[in-house]
Amino acid sequence: MSVESELKKDGIEVIKRLDTLTINTLARNISVRLCKTFPDFGLNQEDLFIKLSRLDMYIAKMPDGMAEANYFYKNSSIYFNEHIPESDLEEFAIHECIHHIQEVKDKKNYLIRMGLCDYTEFKIYGLGLNEAAVQLMASKVIGIEKESVKYFGINFETSSPSYYPLECCLVEQLAYLIGEDVLFESTINSNDNFKNKMIETVSYKSFMAIQNAIDEILYHEEEIIKINNKIASIDDRNKKVDNMLKRIQDLKNEITLTFMRTQNLIISSYFDNTFNSITNLENLEMFRRKLYHFKDYLGSAEGYTFFNDYYIQ
């Protein structure tokens, strides 16, 4: 499928291309900010500027619910929603520029990897994990403060209240436990350091379950957006709309359950394994403190007691 066909399928209609001066300004500013925020990840400011300045960037009409900016790897282009003020383009471009830095292609120019996400012939693994990690990196570059939010009955604090908030909450938990630096370094350099560290800490089975669950949350959210857009195109409420609304509620319930199950798995798999490796009182105290402060990353809902029960056992 051509890029034009894919854009049309996704409801993206190009209005205009950004001029070279604007693209170069965005490339320069973003390369400076990335290198300043992540000085230890082997990034070179001039190399980044050259790489990012070669991107094409467009203003486009986009359907409701779609991200305000989208990167298309097939033509190395970023598409911005027409409603974004020119002064805000840079903040929205950061996430998409990180995607461009991440991409790994084979000799036939097929995408095989993007950060923490692997593109195989039959399935994509780690899409939700990667999107959340990139968004957390972008939030760090921009300097977004954490705020309290509530989604699908889940209360938590996040530095990404508007984009992938539930996925970001779970990935922030992983960053706290495994290490933010190893997470972000693997994300932007597209390597397995974070994955290997997680497998070493929680087991391969638990890592795959966590990764797949975050993907599932992302896919359910995307399905909700598509259904809402279909409902918006129907003039009169009828049985078909009622079935769509029921499907949305079922998806929301499934997202909540998946989030809680995944959070519980993160807690039990990490802390059970860590507890078994304790050899002295100093290790025990470090374990206790780390478990206690996990509460700062917790998503809570009515009737949720797993973390408190785990802590006092």
Predicted regions mapped to residue ranges:
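Pan-zinc metallopeptidase signature
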Residues: 8, 154-312
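Auxiliary, metal-adjacent structural segments of Zn-dependent hydrolase domains
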Residues: 10-87, 107-110
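Active-site recognition of the HExxH zinc-binding catalytic motif
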Residues: 91-107, 131, 135, 139
